[in-house]
């Protein structure tokens, strides 16, 4: 999951960029600086919010403060949303869209840390499309490990133009395994006949 998030952010953010996320986001609290490392130095800029969720109003205020100092400060880079959050709360598709609307008003791409994405879908009662690209998400870290798979995550990139850069960064970062088919086989079974959703409903 850490690699999925960090490599995803690396294709969205320059080394001098800012990644806006909640102060209790997994990329801030539990990834040992991996996003900063894989992006080449991008800064995580923290956003407050009750129950580990950002609000559009607070996100807008924080984004507005960053990147206005010219060469002396980090530039606006991307927004990362954790869904479900580290506190177990869930953004609805409408709430994701509201955050993405703020992001797009500053021309910022949106990343979703979906380590518990399936749990969020089940709780919100929406489709994967409604929670992601239809709501303005550009890249999804799609978790399998926290829902029954063994060491398997996927990254879903909705802009095909970004996919090749991700492939190169994955290889360079040591995450292209020679026996990757054994991981892919898990994901294939996971997504067949709704197994992933049944597991999430039981969790």
PLM feature segments, named:
Residues 1-202:
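Conserved PLP-enzyme active-site core in the AAT-like
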